[in-house]
């Protein structure tokens, strides 16, 4: 069970909820990192008194350093700071709650120190899953997923003695705010529309990914990497109520599911306490007041990001890094109102068609593919 954490991405949605859980469980916080949110990380530092606080932005870090002069907390910046936080000797668990490829190097560094990784940064496994899982095996690092779907799968395979017993993993998907709409209806959807998720409160980027269904596509790839399963054994279904968080079907026909309220603190808490469970102060699921649970197939022709993700998962190599980098850039442009909603899959597809794909997977090739994908999207905007 976790006693002390280094939290990468403390000011985002997952980061803030992780600190709520840390407060409940009485965990020590050894390190906090964020991009540039000086006010919030200062508040967090004053409450949790970490040994290390990192702001990626150097100017913001300089301001934080001045504000925390009365504390013993050391303030660092940039990738050097992130790596220092990820390898902090006084943290036994590193929570990777940063968004995007920026989490890859710190995650690998933490793995090389044999840390437990509470993984909320799906891009790390999407782009470099084989490297990450091989490194975890080599250095004896434990990876416990924080995504609600992958936490559900993780819990449902705890009694599985042989991965050969698994027939398939079934990831559930709310369908997002635009479920049931046509491509023509999607064309006029705005940033504000996309950020109104029906069930979950999340950061802007992942909420848009949920609206395009790219989030589910990335999660399919993540599940393949986590459990070393082929694409044919990982499915996604629409479940509007977000009560069943995912399922595992075994070869004997048994199907195990994890149910709960749509609250990210549940998988966060489990990642902190695994292999044990802690009492929760939060509202729990009342089966007698549940709405009817429904399931449906996703519409991959309308929501093409899911289809593109499946295609990249089948190809392998740097295709997934190109997919992810292009999507991050396209979603960023959408959030700036620079492109429309339907432009997101179009830009991702254009990058996949123009950026060279290679089958080998070194860290340098992954980073190069990510950079090229972003440049390709920028060129089309």
Model-derived regions: residue spans:
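Catalytic, metal-anchored helix/loop core of enzyme active sites in primary metabolism
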Residues: 1-381
């Amino acid at each position: 069970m976790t006693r002390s954490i280094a939290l990468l991405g403390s000011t985002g949605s997952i980061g803030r909820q992780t600190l709520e859980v840390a407060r409940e469980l009485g965990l020590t916080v050894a390190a906090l990192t964020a991009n540039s949110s000086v006010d919030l990380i200062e508040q967090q530092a004053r409450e949790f008194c970490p040994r290390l606080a990192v702001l990626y932005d150097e100017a913001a870090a300089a301001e934080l350093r001045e504000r925390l002069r009365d504390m013993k907390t050391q303030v660092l910046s940039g990738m050097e700071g992130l790596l220092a936080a990820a390898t902090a000797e006084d943290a036994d668990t590193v929570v990777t709650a940063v968004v995007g490829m920026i989490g890859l190097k710190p995650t690998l560094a933490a793995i090389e120190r044999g840390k437990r990784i509470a993984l909320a940064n799906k891009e790390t496994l999407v782009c470099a899953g084989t490297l990450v899982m091989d490194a975890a095996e080599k250095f004896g690092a434990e990876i416990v997923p924080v995504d609600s779907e992958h936490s559900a799968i993780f819990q449902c395979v705890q009694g599985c003695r042989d991965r050969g017993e698994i027939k398939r993993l079934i990831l559930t998907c709310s369908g997002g705010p635009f479920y049931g709409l046509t491509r023509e209806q999607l064309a006029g959807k705005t940033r504000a529309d996309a950020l109104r998720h029906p069930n979950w409160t999340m950061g802007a980027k992942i909420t848009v990914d949920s609206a395009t269904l790219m989030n589910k596509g990335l999660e399919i790839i993540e599940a393949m990497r986590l459990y070393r399963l082929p694409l044919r054994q990982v499915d996604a279904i629409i479940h509007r109520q977000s009560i069943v968080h995912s399922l595992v079907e075994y070869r004997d026909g048994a199907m195990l599911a994890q149910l709960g309220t749509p609250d990210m603190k549940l998988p966060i808490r489990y990642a902190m306490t695994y292999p044990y469970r802690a009492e929760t102060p939060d509202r729990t699921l009342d089966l007698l007041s549940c709405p009817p649970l429904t399931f449906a197939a996703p519409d991959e022709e309308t929501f093409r990001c899911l289809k593109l993700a499946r295609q990249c998962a089948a190809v392998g190599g740097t295709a997934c890094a190109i997919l992810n980098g292009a999507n991050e850039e396209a979603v960023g442009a959408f959030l700036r109102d620079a492109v429309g909603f339907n432009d997101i899959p179009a830009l991702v597809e254009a990058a996949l068609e123009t950026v060279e794909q290679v089958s080998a997977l070194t860290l340098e090739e992954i980073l190069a593919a990510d950079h090229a994908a972003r440049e390709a999207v920028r060129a089309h905007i």
